[in-house]
């Protein structure tokens, strides 16, 4: 399957590293124009833009904190100025926060995770849908997680935000469908990125993690990117309102492989 997205205008939030960077590259390789959103490390965003341009693609880098609705409004107006609209939004920006049991969690830290992961996704989806609904086309794809459904001790804000992303995806999909717009999500499992280097670089922790994954390996960012590119293309034109999990079987309760 050779997915093509020529002429499509895409925004990927949190795109200067990890899964976001892989998605941006995947969209560009498929022919889309890509706006790379970042908060910090502008040099990484600029490097990604240059990588895309060297492949004869089109990309721009735009700094914005998605947890700030005013900044999100400015972000979308910059895309309007560059490309006169948007066809694809990838809500990828997210943080997991410091580990702490619920009753020991700092309230401000808890709130920050919700503001970035949930409010940020909503603010961006809201701006995108304002543009997609009148043109009667477009796709919003939210990056969720296996922790949309799997509890994760010490990360109550993160799991709450991802569970909420699942229902936000369904509700916005229901609202937008009559206008020709799809809304869906992808739920990565354990993906080998810098954010979890402390796990995959530690043999003991890695062994424990792999025991939870039936395919017995971590995923690569490019594996998420390939799924995302397909889902936002016309090859998935009948898919909306669902989270597609890309997790090596992590959600299939591997402990029951041999009878529990």
What is each model feature region?
Residues 9, 16-17:
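Conserved glycine-rich cofactor-binding loop
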Residues 85, 177, 182, 239-241:
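Short, small/polar-rich loop/turn modules that mediate ligand/substrate recognition or access, typified
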Residues 99, 150, 229, 240-260:
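Short C-terminal tail/terminal secondary-structure segment
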Residues 100-102, 106-111, 209:
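Substrate-binding pocket helix/loop in short-chain dehydrogenase/reductase
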Residues 125, 161, 169:
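Active-site helix of classical SDR
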Residues 130, 174-175, 237:
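Alpha-helical segment proximal to the catalytic Tyr-Lys
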Residues 145:
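Residue(s) in the substrate-gating loop at a strand-loop-helix junction
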